[in-house]
Amino acid sequence: MAEAETNPVLQVIPSDSPLKENKKYPPELLQFNGLGWRAYYHCHPASRAGDHRFKGEHGHFHIFVRIKDEPEKWSHFVALAMNNMGQPIGFFTVNQWVTGEEWESAKKLIKYLDDIPFSEQKEVVEMWLLSLLIINRDLIAAVLVERDNIITVKKGQVPDADIKKDKGLYLLSEVPLDYKKILI
């Protein structure tokens, strides 16, 4: 992408139309050769109340994984925040109501990191996203465990509530990317 003077965000947003907030890019989603992963990019209005943003975030990729025993069902895996230059700045997780997918425990989701079909990808953005998951395996595992811990704590505070549907609870966990730690 660097040689072509582009980045992952520019790769999924059409160059012939203006960026629209809350719209999924690409519209048909990234499909990863039908091998159990999918993703899309979008951004939110800066003024949206209760929204989470990393400092300097332009938008983010939501990444999903197909549930192995139920091939028609998908689970939100993690979101990847991107800055205005199209570079990744952090991973985060959101509550179930945000994306409406099936909920899988951190323990189950972490196992998917051991089975990423990287070598079978042909599209550059899909290879790039999967490579970030591989390189940041430990960070992603930690953010998923923290996500589940937050749900457990909240459930303890309000036992009868369905915490995963609580619209007052958007962000569950986050971790900024520190390239010095990743590359050393």
Regions found by a protein language model. Name each.
Residues 1-32:
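N-terminal domain-onset segments
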Residues 66-134:
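An exposed acidic His-Trp-rich patch
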Residues 125-184:
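Long, compositionally biased interface segments
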Residues 7, 22, 33, 83-84, ...:
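Detector for Asparagine
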Residues 28-92:
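Aromatic- and glycine-enriched beta-alpha-beta binding-site module
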Residues 38-39, 110, 168:
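Intrinsically disordered, low-complexity segments enriched in small/polar residues
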Residues 12, 33, 50-55, 85, ...:
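Low-complexity, charged, repeat-rich alpha-helical/coil interaction segments
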